[in-house]
């Protein structure tokens, strides 16, 4: 097939559960150059007089060329095409609980932003998940008796690590020269980023988005901040959605202020990046920040709807969500909430125009 276009921009999303794919080839409305599209089961090739753009599908994903349908041109957006795919089911997500922490291991805690060691060579004898943060509200709503553990926080012992929705609780009594005050921030000595807060004289909360935990014999993994934050948040959302059958979340700061309303649409998306070379006409902005030139890649991602709540935006909707027991709160440092909002906004701006909004919400992908 051939259409008139210039400076082709390629977007390809594969839905594993639906066994379908959406292909969008963007270009200006008027003028342009000749564009040819070749589709095979394992690749997609877009040729123009100036060069070509190629998308190679990862193992386990195959297009069905004969199923091309729904062809339409949307002004200001580009050529839309839907295909059937043969795709293996989504890989089972690795639990945030088990990815970094295993009982009996000697671990080191690092600041994710700069690599500064926060806790060195800590042997963890028990790694246990905590009850849900809104457990008391659930008991009050569904049980005929009061919560027997109300106002009785769980504190880890010296070699324990308790896992919350978005944080780790550890006992730092043996690591500190003087007894810390409760409800004070834990700041990285090198980069001054907020890593967590003290809950009592012995218990410290570290946020998963700020700390990397690795076996002590290993080294600090230098992961780009945006990639790390997207991965951690995406995994948390997938786990909470699966475990508690909730798909709506309020992202709030340590002060309780709501920054983002987030609604998980699906977790089976595969977003595929075209190979890039000097002859290729355009990069795919959603992924380019974390890939090297000349490479191609595919990312598992979750698709979310979101609404920002900063500067009193969406105040009534935020109040409604906060009062809804089916909406789960996720607490992060205030600076991280703003980081996440910036990532969502950038990812939204990189999507084709027709995909950027759904009803009154904005759309974005978070890479797993």
From Swiss-Prot:
Keywords: Acetylation, Cytoplasm, Metal-binding, Transferase, Ubl conjugation, Ubl conjugation pathway, Zinc. Its EC number is 2.3.2.26. Residues 214-236 are annotated as: Interaction with UBE2C. Signal peptide: none annotated. GO terms for cellular component: cytosol; ubiquitin ligase complex. It is an enzyme of class 2 (transferase). The keyword Ubl conjugation applies. One of its GO terms (biological process) is protein polyubiquitination. Residues 332-368 are annotated as: HECT-like. Ubiquitinated by UBCH10 (E2 ubiquitin-conjugating enzyme). InterPro entries: UBQ-conj_enz_E2-bd_prot (IPR019193). Zn(2+) binds at residue 144. GO terms for molecular function: cyclin binding; ribonuclease inhibitor activity; ubiquitin protein ligase activity; ubiquitin-like protein conjugating enzyme binding. It catalyses: S-ubiquitinyl-[E2 ubiquitin-conjugating enzyme]-L-cysteine + [acceptor protein]-L-lysine = [E2 ubiquitin-conjugating enzyme]-L-cysteine + N(6)-ubiquitinyl-[acceptor protein]-L-lysine. Disulfide bonds: none annotated. Interacts with UBE2C/UbcH10 (E2 ubiquitin-conjugating enzyme). In vitro, interacts with cyclin-B. E3 ubiquitin-protein ligase which accepts ubiquitin from specific E2 ubiquitin-conjugating enzymes, and transfers it to substrates, generally promoting their degradation by the proteasome. Independently of its E3 ubiquitin-protein ligase activity, acts as an inhibitor of CPSF3 endonuclease activity by blocking CPSF3 active site. The C-terminal half (AA 188-389) is able to bind cyclin-B and shows a self-ubiquitination activity (mono-, poly, or multi-ubiquitination) in a HECT-like sequence dependent manner. This is E3 ubiquitin-protein ligase E3D. It comes from Mus musculus. The lineage of its organism: Eukaryota, Metazoa, Chordata, Craniata, Vertebrata. The gene is Ube3d.
């Amino acid at each position: 097939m051939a259409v008139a276009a210039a400076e082709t921009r390629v977007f390809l999303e594969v839905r594993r559960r639906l066994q379908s794919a959406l292909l969008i080839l963007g270009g200006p409305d008027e003028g342009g150059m000749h564009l040819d599209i070749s589709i095979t089961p394992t690749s997609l090739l877009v040729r123009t007089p100036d060069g070509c753009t190629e998308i190679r599908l990862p193992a386990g994903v195959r297009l069905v060329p004969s199923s091309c349908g729904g062809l339409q041109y949307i002004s200001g957006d580009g050529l839309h095409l839907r295909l059937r795919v043969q795709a293996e089911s989504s890989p089972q997500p690795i639990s945030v609980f088990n990815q970094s922490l295993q009982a009996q291991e000697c671990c080191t805690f690092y600041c994710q932003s700069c690599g500064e060691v926060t806790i060195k060579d800590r042997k963890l004898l028990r790694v246990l998940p905590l009850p849900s943060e809104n457990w008391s509200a659930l008991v009050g709503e569904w049980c005929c008796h009061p919560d027997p553990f109300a106002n009785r926080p769980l504190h880890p012992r010296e070699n324990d690590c308790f896992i919350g929705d978005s944080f780790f609780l550890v006992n730092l009594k043996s690591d500190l020269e003087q007894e810390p005050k409760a409800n004070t921030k834990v700041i990285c000595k090198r980069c001054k980023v907020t890593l967590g807060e003290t809950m009592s004289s012995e218990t410290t909360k570290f946020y998963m988005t700020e700390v990397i935990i690795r076996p002590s014999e290993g080294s600090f993994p230098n992961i780009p901040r945006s990639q790390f934050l997207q991965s951690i948040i995406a995994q948390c959302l997938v786990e909470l959605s699966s475990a508690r059958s909730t798909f709506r979340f309020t992202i709030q700061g340590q002060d309780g202020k709501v920054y983002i309303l987030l609604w998980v649409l699906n977790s089976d998306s595969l977003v595929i990046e075209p190979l890039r070379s000097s002859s290729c006409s355009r990069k795919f902005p959603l992924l380019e920040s974390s890939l090297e030139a000349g490479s191609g890649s595919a990312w598992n991602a979750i698709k979310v709807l979101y609404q920002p709540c900063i500067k009193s935006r969406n105040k009534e909707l935020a109040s409604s969500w906060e009062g809804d027991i089916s909406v789960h709160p996720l607490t992060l440092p205030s600076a991280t909430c703003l980081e996440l909002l910036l990532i969502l906004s950038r990812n939204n701006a990189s999507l084709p125009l027709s995909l950027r909004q759904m009803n009154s919400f904005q759309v974005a992908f978070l890479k797993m």
